[in-house]
């Protein structure tokens, strides 16, 4: 009985909102129709429906509850890490039973997937916004650092230690590939003498083979290596900084990051 009451409490507001929305729409539609006439009123209703009717009150409420669940999940991750994420603990914080939340997320893994998807999408959008303005690899690297510093726990969820027992679906790989594609394009646009893989090396030959990780990007091996070098070295510096390993070492992590970028931008000599 307790579970049923909780589920009714979580979903009940959606029913109330739906009823209120229908009542309001009916009254408004009646008034508008009387003043404007059938044809004009129909056009107005169509336009309003395209905007507000895209999501029903129930759907809006469901999205609101899911957003609240994710907010509590991020707080849990900040306090104890992603491996300790618990829907039952979130339910307790929200004042409902555990089974009530399974109406919104089928389980822990689905919730983690949603958080990872949100994180990757946020970073991919930030990187792409810079890329379309012509940002070079260094510019994209600054976007990465700013994004990571804004929310370290979000960064570590996608680039830190994998969550035990969790396996991300392939759709997540697609979003992460967008980030690499923008970096590859920026690296391919650099001057030919920019740092890259010297031809004839085993790694150069390896990069010339089909590259699933690059999602079929047409960048030449030198640009591929350049992008990998940027990605691995800068993530290394960022991960150490965000984990607090530079604390007490009497240097500015931002300057170290910039020095790494300078080294990556220097021509081969």
Identify the meaning behind each predicted range.
Residues 1-63:
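N-terminal intrinsically disordered/low-complexity leader segments
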Residues 2-11, 17, 185-269:
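C-terminal peripheral helix-coil segments that are non-catalytic and often amphipathic
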Residues 51-58, 105, 109, 165, ...:
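A short, mixed-charge helix-start or loop-turn motif at secondary-structure junctions
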Residues 64, 68-75, 79, 110-130, ...:
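Alpha-helical structural segments
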Residues 68, 72, 76, 80-110:
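Helix-turn-helix
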Residues 128, 149, 153-157, 239-242, ...:
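Charged/polar positions within long, soluble alpha-helices
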Residues 138-160, 173-195:
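Helical hydrophobic small-molecule/effector-binding pocket
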Residues 159-172, 250-251:
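Short helix/strand-bridging catalytic loops that position acidic/His residues to coordinate divalent metals
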């Amino acid at each position: 009985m307790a579970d049923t009451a909780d589920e009714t409490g979580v979903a009940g507001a959606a029913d109330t909102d739906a009823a209120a929305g229908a009542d309001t729409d009916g009254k408004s539609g009646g008034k508008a129709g009387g003043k404007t006439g059938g044809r004009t009123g129909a056009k107005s209703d169509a336009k309003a429906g395209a905007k507000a009717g895209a999501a029903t009150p129930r759907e809006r409420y469901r999205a609101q509850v899911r957003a609240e669940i994710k907010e509590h999940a991020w707080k849990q991750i900040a306090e104890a890490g992603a491996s300790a994420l618990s829907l039952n603990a979130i339910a307790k914080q929200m004042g409902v039973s555990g089974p009530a939340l399974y109406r919104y997320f089928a389980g822990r893994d689905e919730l983690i997937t949603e958080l990872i998807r949100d994180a990757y999408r946020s970073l991919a959008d930030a990187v792409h916004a810079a890329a379309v303005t012509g940002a070079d690899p260094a510019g994209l690297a600054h976007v990465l650092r700013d994004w990571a510093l804004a929310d370290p726990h979000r960064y570590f969820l996608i680039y830190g230690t994998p969550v035990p027992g969790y396996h991300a679906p392939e759709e997540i790989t697609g979003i992460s590939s967008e980030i690499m594609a923008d970096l590859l394009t920026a690296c391919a646009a650099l001057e030919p003498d920019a740092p890259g893989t010297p031809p004839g090396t085993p790694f150069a030959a390896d990069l010339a083979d089909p590259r699933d990780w690059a999602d079929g990007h047409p960048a030449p091996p030198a640009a591929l290596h350049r992008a990998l070098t940027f990605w691995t070295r800068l993530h290394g510096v960022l991960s150490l900084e965000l984990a607090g390993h530079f604390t007490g070492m009497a240097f500015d992590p931002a300057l170290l990051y910039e020095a790494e970028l300078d080294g990556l931008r220097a021509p081969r000599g």
